[in-house]
Regions:
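N-terminal leader/linker segments that precede catalytic domains of diphosphate-processing enzymes
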Residues: 1-168, 173, 178-257
């Protein structure tokens, strides 16, 4: 308890950190150590991709309020007290673009703590990759602090983003979100040979040809055959049926385990 006599030759800090019980330490810590430390605000931001007609699309919002009013931003927001980052992602995706997001489709990407990244004050963001099927396009609607939901094309060969055919530049984005998008491209391309989560960009059921088309889009020029695809990702997918195409052989259908 606070006010307990400290043995001679020992500092109060040493006593409570080393010799007291954890309950006594925490009581002392919250009274003695917390006030001098400033605390950052913590946000989550999501690089939310989908794969539509052979192109990678990125869900962004156009901010309706300061800071960076009218700029494009990743879906995200401040974490609530008592929630972890993944559940904050689920909540923000629901609030901002009206989508239900399963936890398995959320992948932590990078923590960004660059001083001055947010003009409102000290803010740390935990950025995530989010994989959405193309049917998500039919469900999105703007909410919360989003003026509108914007879908941009992302060229994984050049790293460039396009809106209505116009190339976007760094100043079009809020905060440091342009750099976070670039980091997401690098992460996906580095991990594609051993991490099958990118396959969540496909529909629930898909063919090997669908998977090959996605690999080629994410890693342009990368050579991948049907046999190699099944060798790499066979442990993560299961065969669920087949379909017949006129004048062609039967094609197997798969889904992620």
């Amino acid at each position: 308890m606070i006010g307990q006599k400290i043995p001679a030759g020992m500092t109060e800090k040493e006593y409570f950190e080393v010799h007291a019980s954890q309950e006594e330490f925490l009581e002392w810590y919250h009274q003695q150590e917390l006030p001098p430390y400033e605390k950052p605000s913590v946000t989550v931001d999501m690089v939310a991709y989908c794969f539509v007609e052979g192109k990678i699309k990125l869900f962004l919002i156009r901010r309706k309020a300061h800071p960076f009013q009218n700029c494009l931003a990743l879906v995200g927001g401040f974490m609530d007290k008592g929630e972890d980052a993944a559940h904050a992602c689920q909540r923000e995706v629901k609030e901002e673009i009206n989508l239900e997001l399963p936890l398995e489709k959320i992948e932590q990407l990078v923590t960004v703590s660059t001083p001055g990244r947010d003009p409102r004050g000290w803010t740390v963001t935990i950025a995530h990759l989010v994989y959405l099927p193309s049917r998500a396009l039919e469900l999105v609607q703007a909410g919360d602090d989003a003026k509108e939901v914007v879908l941009v094309d992302v060229d994984f060969h050049t790293g460039k983003c396009y809106l209505d055919g116009k190339e976007l530049v760094e100043k079009d984005f809020a905060f440091d979100h342009a750099a976070i998008i670039q980091e997401s491209i690098r992460k996906i391309q580095e991990a594609i040979d051993y991490d099958p989560r990118f396959l969540y960009l496909l529909e629930d059921e898909f063919t090997v040809d669908d998977g090959l088309a996605l690999v080629e889009t994410l890693c342009p020029g990368k050579s991948c055959t049907s046999d190699r695809f099944l060798s790499k990702y066979g442990h993560s997918i299961e065969e669920v049926g087949f379909k017949r195409i006129p004048q062609k052989e039967v094609i197997n259908i798969y889904r992620l385990n």
